[in-house]
Amino acid sequence: MSLNADYQKLEPGNEVRLFSVDGTAFGMSDVLRFHAHNIAHTPEEIEAAGGDENKLPAKSIWWQGEEYKAWPCQVEGIEATTDGTSPQPKLTVANLDSSISALCLAYDDLLQAKVTIHDTLAKYLDARNFPQGNPTADPSQEKLKVFYIDARNTETDEVVEFILSSPMDLQGRMIPTRQLHSLCSWCIRNKYRTGDGCDYAGTRYFDKHNNPVDDPSLDECNGTLTACKLRHGDSNELPFGGFPGTSLIRS
């Protein structure tokens, strides 16, 4: 049975959501892993605490060999939309003992930290979560959502709220990054002979009209498939960055 098949059921089982915040790219020493589930203690654990459950710490969840500690948090707005816009969720975490405020001060509000949301079911959790083990443990059964911290929105003594963005939004990219037309994208972006897309480094020179020239300073690619073939040869692999078939389409 797979997670996808479970989600098709009327009662898929107990859902588990785990969070990880990775700021190692800008100097954080550890990945922060946490969950917001209230997991009951066993009678044996309560008895060992002298019958006072308040003496027991909140229980961690182990997933894929990593410990996710209990920490009050919630995420809103991660649902997909139908209008083509990317979601911009809000992650709210408890500011216990001002610990999150301290992280914000130390690491520039955790901007661009990678936030990964793991969704799975309790029956797939690591065996060490269960006193008797777990024969259905399967670390591959999860759904991932990845965002990056784009801004710190609210900060109080109780909570800190972060605005998340998709990786594409954070980098300011637009869709599509390439247009479908018959001209070479590398040429249009002035990347002829740069090695970034266009790797031509030969000694065949042509002007913008595809006429052969001896002076390298007159060498200019016009971005056509013909220009690419003249330089690389008809029988060689071409790094052409266009879509020749689009020239057959007429509006």
UniProtKB/Swiss-Prot annotation:
Highest taxon in the source lineage: Viruses
Keywords per UniProt: 4Fe-4S, Host cytoplasm, Iron, Iron-sulfur, Late protein, Metal-binding, Viral genome ejection through host cell envelope, Viral long flexible tail ejection system, Viral penetration into host cytoplasm, Viral release from host cell, Viral tail assembly, Viral tail protein, Virion, Virus entry into host cell
Cofactor: [4Fe-4S] cluster
Cofactor note: Binds 1 [4Fe-4S] cluster.
Binding site for [4Fe-4S] cluster: C184, C198, C221, C228
Gene Ontology terms, MF aspect: 4 iron, 4 sulfur cluster binding; metal ion binding
Any GO BP: viral tail assembly
Protein family according to the UniProt entry: Belongs to the lambda-like tail tip protein L family.
Function in brief: Part of the distal tail tip complex which plays a role in DNA injection during entry, and in tail assembly initiation during exit. The tail tip complex is assembled successively with three tail central fiber proteins J, one tail tip protein I, one tail tip protein L and one tail tip protein K. The tail tip complex interacts with tail measure protein to initiate tail tube assembly. The formation of the tail tip complex is completed by the addition of tail tip protein M, which is followed by tail tube polymerization.
Protein name as catalogued: Tail tip protein L
Species this protein is from: Escherichia phage N15 (Bacteriophage N15)
